[in-house]
Structures are given as C-alpha cells and as structure tokens.
Amino acid sequence: MYALFLLASLLGAALAGPVLGLKECTRGSAVWCQNVKTASDCGAVKHCLQTVWNKPTVKSLPCDICKDVVTAAGDMLKDNATEEEILVYLEKTCDWLPKPNMSASCKEIVDSYLPVILDIIKGEMSRPGEVCSALNLCESLQKHLAELNHQKQLESNKIPELDMTEVVAPFMANIPLLLYPQDGPRSKPQPKDNGDVCQDCIQMVTDIQTAVRTNSTFVQALVEHVKEECDRLGPGMADICKNYISQYSEIAIQMMMHMQPKEICALVGFCDEVKEMPMQTLVPAKVASKNVIPALELVEPIKKHEVPAKSDVYCEVCEFLVKEVTKLIDNNKTEKEILDAFDKMCSKLPKSLSEECQEVVDTYGSSILSILLEEVSPELVCSMLHLCSGTRLPALTVHVTQPKDGGFCEVCKKLVGYLDRNLEKNSTKQEILAALEKGCSFLPDPYQKQCDQFVAEYEPVLIEILVEVMDPSFVCLKIGACPSAHKPLLGTEKCIWGPSYWCQNTETAAQCNAVEHCKRHVWN
C-alpha cells in the first residue's frame, strides 16, 4: 500500500527518483503515468491520457491554479504565442504554488518537458484537468479516497466490521486465473476431482495463514509472486492485474486471516458453499452461572467459588481508599507512586480498622487502581469488587476446571490485553463476543490452542466482566484464571456474604430475611 501513497504524491516527490530505465518501464501504467516525466521516458503519454489522467480529480488549490493556467496557455497557443512566451508564463505560474519544493519541481518539469506539455495542451484544450493530472498537480480522486480509507483504519483501534464478500471476493476470484491461465478463449475449465481440489485449496489457505503469522516477509513475497503471475495474462491484462493486486492485496490478506479456510475456498469456487451456522443464543447472566461452562477434564469434586459481599467495615475501608486514590490520580501521580502510598493510607484510619484496611490493600489495592484508571465512576468501584452491597453487580457462581499452576493465567492476560488495545470503551457484548472469537488468531502460535480452550471454558463469565472493565490482571484474577496471592475476605456470618448466598434457595433467603429481595432482583 505504500506504493499508492508514493503514486499519489505531488510533483516534488515524483522528481526525487532517478531517470527511469528499461526495467522500470516494464512495470506498467502504475509507473508510466506518475507524471509527464515518467510517461515521456517510457513512451506512454498517449496511453496515460486515455486510461489514467482522464479520471476524476480532487479539488485543491494547486489543481485549480493549474487548470486556469492550462486554459490560458491554450488561448495563447490559439493567438500564435511563441514557446518562449508560454514557458515564461508557466514558470511564473509555478511561483504561485503554496510550497517551495512544489514550486521548484514545477519549474524543473516545465523546463525539461515543455514540448511534450504543449503537445498535450494542444490535444486536450477542452479538458485542462487531464493536463494537470499529467503534471501531477491534480490528484486522482480514486487514489485520494483509497488513502483516506487506509488512514482511517490506521487511526482507529476498533476491529473493523467489513463485508467479507465485497472486499475479498474480487481479489480471490482472480486467483484461479492467475495460477491456471487459460490457453485460449475456447478452453474449458478443468473438472473437480471428487473433492480433492477442495482439500488442496483448504490445505493451501491453511499453510498461507500459518506463514503470515510466523514469517514477517511472507506477505510481501506472496504479493510479488502473484504480480509475476500477472505477466502470463498478456500485455493488456498484465498491467490491470498488477494494479489491482497493489490496490487490494493488503486488505484481502487481512480479511483472509479472519475467515476459515473452507469459507475462502468456497468463495472462489473450489469447495461447495459453506452453510451458515446460527450463532448460539447468549444466556442471561443469572442463568450463565449454572452449568454452561464445560469442564475440559475429569477432576476431583469441584468447590463452588463465590464472590461474597463484604461487611460494612470492609465497605467503608474500600470507599475511603477509593477517595484517596482518586485524589492522587487527579494530582497526576504515577501508578507506582499510588501503589507505594497505599500503606500510608491505612495509617490515617483508627487502629481498630488498620487490620481490615491492610487486608483490603493487599487483596484489592491494584484492582482498585486499575478500575479507577479505566475511568469507572468511583461510586461503583467497591460494588464491582463486592466489598459493598446494594447496587453492586450480581455475584457470579461458576464451576470451572482448575488449571494446574494457573495454566490459563498467561494466555488470559494476553487475550484481555489484546481486547483492551483493540476495543473502544463502552463496547457492547456483541462486539466483545466478536473480538473474543477473533482474538486467539492474533496471538503467537504457542498460545493459540490454549487460548481457544480458555475462551470455550470462560466465555460467558468473561463477557460479563469485560463489559465493565478490561484490565488484564484484574479480569484474570476475578474469573479465577490467575491464582490470588491472598485469600478473599470473608465475613463471620454467612448472611453478610450478600445475595450470592441469600438467594441460593428459599431456605437461605428466609434465614437471612431476604425473600422479597431475591424475588425482585434474582429469581424473577
């Protein structure tokens, strides 16, 4: 795609390179039609006028000035003005251009190629835009829009939602012709051999996807190889083929990495069409907590992990810490300075609360900071950590296979880190789900299989948490993928654990005097 930016640059950039030789002139109109200089050196002025320079252009100051000048120069030719007079007029016009390097380049090309320019003006008096495109002072509208689209993708960290068929199909549909050119117009397509062609295609696409992930130079080599195949299409089609590959190869490869090999092969006709599978219905949070996360292996009886609400003491301590951390953040303190200040915060509380404060700091200190740095409202932090009841999030009860020694911890952090970098704040559950399904393919090979297992096991509970916060350490600790350095804080009475305990059944609800609460907020 960098070639497109170079081809769309103005006159100064066009003159920066050496004089074209025979080898460069064999590369087609992408090289010939950069400007009058390259077209003249390659003997392709007429071709460029008929196929490239006659396309719509972008409205700009250099382009408008150029059109006025060309029109005036045409009138001067009608009045039998000499070449010297027109040269002086054109050079004076170059001085009007806004940038010094553009003005100098304009004068150089006018001095060197005046006869060619005059011939173009004589033949295209009614279309000054074509002459200005030849001078590279009017930019192609098609190239300009392509650059804007590419720049927009670079500036956004959101995973694009593109129409796969619209983007990939034209590029991929040409692959059979490139790899297996036809001998003549009467040749017949080769028949498929009982699905062998489909399997070969799937294997080829799989190998390509693997190579793209593991070999940084493979993509460029692949594009160059396909361009070489374009030469087999003959002089007329070869240039069109190469230009097409240059324009669409990058986005086609990007989309190919998001598709299954069989989908791609069906798209280009090597495999039967893949039937669409309906997406699995998302289960509400309160239902997702029971028997929806499959165990990967048989293990000893699994204990039920609950995140209980804490007593009022822990709630008050948490709210105090949140206020202190918020003040430090507002004063532009660094993360390290804030973490170092946690112990001093506890000294501000009465001695009767120092032990509880230290427990909260040790267990939840980094999580409090991470959540606040995500610009979450301070009033919600302690509820999210289940240290305060009331408006807190419903506790999630999950049954998971315990990985040995935190086996999923590293892959969890890498995946959540990927989501944090590529998803915008306030992303919907659907956007998070789509990103989860694609995220594993972007991790290094050693993590991909483990990542797929991790997503299959943790997906429901992971989505619920990612809607609120995307800090890798906090999320992976919260869902149990990473082991905690401290035991969670528990109250002395089970009823202070909150709704996660109250609403287990009618007996516990009655025991904690919470039947009405459970009916309104949990059992409905």
UniProtKB/Swiss-Prot annotation:
User: According to the UniProt record, which cysteines are disulfide-bonded?
Assistant: 63-138, 66-132, 94-106, 198-271, 201-265, 230-241, 315-388, 318-382, 346-357, 409-482, 412-476, 440-451
Reply yes or no: does the keyword ATP-binding apply: no
Indicate the segments forming the Saposin B-type domain, all copies. Answer: 59-142, 194-275, 311-392, 405-486
Q: What are the glycosylated positions?
A: 80, 101, 215, 332, 426
Q: Where does it reside? A: Lysosome
Q: What is its main location?
A: other
Q: What is one term from the GO cellular component aspect held by the record?
A: lysosomal membrane
- In the record, which residues are listed under signal peptide? 1-16
Q: In the UniProt record, does the keyword Aminoacyl-tRNA synthetase occur?
A: no
MF terms from GO for this chain are: enzyme activator activity; ganglioside GM1 binding; ganglioside GM2 binding; ganglioside GM3 binding; ganglioside GP1c binding; ganglioside GT1b binding; identical protein binding; phospholipid binding
Give one Pfam family. Answer: SapA
Tell me what effect the entry lists for residue 240 to C.
Strongly decreases stimulation of cerebroside sulfate hydrolysis
Propeptide residue interval(s)? 17-59, 143-194, 275-310, 393-404, 487-524
Q: Which GO terms describe its biological process?
A: adenylate cyclase-inhibiting G protein-coupled receptor signaling pathway; epithelial cell differentiation involved in prostate gland development; ganglioside GM1 transport to membrane; lysosomal transport; positive regulation of beta-galactosidase activity; prostate gland growth; regulation of autophagy; regulation of lipid metabolic process
Q: What else is known?
A: Saposin-B co-purifies with 1 molecule of phosphatidylethanolamine.
The illness linked here is: Combined saposin deficiency: An autosomal recessive storage disorder characterized by hepatosplenomegaly and severe neurologic disease, due to absence of all saposins. PSAPD has a fatal outcome in infancy. Metachromatic leukodystrophy due to saposin B deficiency: A form of metachromatic leukodystrophy biochemically characterized by tissue accumulation of cerebroside-3-sulfate, saposin B deficiency, and normal arylsulfatase A activity. Clinical manifestations include periventricular white matter abnormalities, demyelination, and peripheral neuropathy. Additional neurological features include dysarthria, ataxic gait, psychomotor regression, seizures, cognitive decline and spastic quadriparesis.
Full protein name: Prosaposin
